[in-house]
Amino acid sequence: MTTKEAIADMALEAQEEDDAGPPDGGFRAWLVVLGGFLAYFVTFGMLNSFGTFQEYYGEKLLPGRSTSEISWIGSLQLFLLFIGGLFFGPVFDAKGSKVLFIPGTLLLSLSQMMVSLCKEYYQFILAQSLLFGIAVAMLFYPTISAISHWFHHRRGLAMGIVLTGSSLGGIAWPLILERLFAVVGFPWGLRIVGFISFALLAPACFMVIPRLPPRKSGGLSKADLSEGLKDRRYWLTVVGMLFVIWGMFIPFYYIPLFAMDHGVNSSFANSLISILNAGSFVGRIVSGALADKLGR
């Protein structure tokens, strides 16, 4: 870090000390929540709908591939999403949200257009796993970081509202995808989805804005990082999240195939993904509000 950057960070720290803190409301803060809702509707809504792709690929596009091989397409998406925090978190700290949100929006729409052209397994890995996974990471981390800038005492509620976007997306996308595949076919179905995604994410690029200015040095110092890594509460959270995430996405990937193996027709089996996502809608808001009241 240069002397100039150090001085800039010292000035920023002084500004933060004088700052009254997150407003916990107001037009600008709730606009960030709305932008996050739109982002999660597209990103996690689509991730939560992978079971639709899993079933369709096995039946139509990749019949020679095993269920395990096809599930790697979705699994790599999740890997890139979560590992992406190591790279995109510091970028947000140093540059703000737009430098991630705008290219992330373009990359996500591009990935869906590219998936519409895929015919071979490796092409799906490149377009749907690699491009889409990176794009989701570029949108995910600025959103959760910006929410913490604007909310403190009501952060759980705000994040719960944002997360309902993933529930509503998980309800809508399986039904939309199934209908589009039946009416216009897979290629044009994905292109239409790409246009819809862009239309929803474009305004979010200008809604999800941090309250605090970026740090020129790129976020935490080595001393801050070292102190955080020594905190037992941090490691308890990490271990807890490991077990939560470990099995969380399995139903979203496999419930249609499981249902069809037990005699359920393919259309209703696909609808089970929407039903599964609907079950999480109320819980996301209620659990967030309770976290604010009872402690996080």
Swiss-Prot record:
Phenotypic effect of disruption: Blocks the secretions of pyranterreones.
Pfam annotation, one family: MFS_1
Membrane topology qualifier: Multi-pass membrane protein
Induction (UniProt): Expression is positively regulated by the cluster-specific transcription factor pytR.
Residues modified by glycosylation: N265
Coiled coil start-end: none
SUPFAM superfamilies: MFS general substrate transporter
UniProt KW keywords: Cell membrane, Glycoprotein, Membrane, Transmembrane, Transmembrane helix, Transport
Designated name of the protein: MFS-type transporter pytF
Source organism of the structure: Aspergillus terreus (strain NIH 2624 / FGSC A1156)
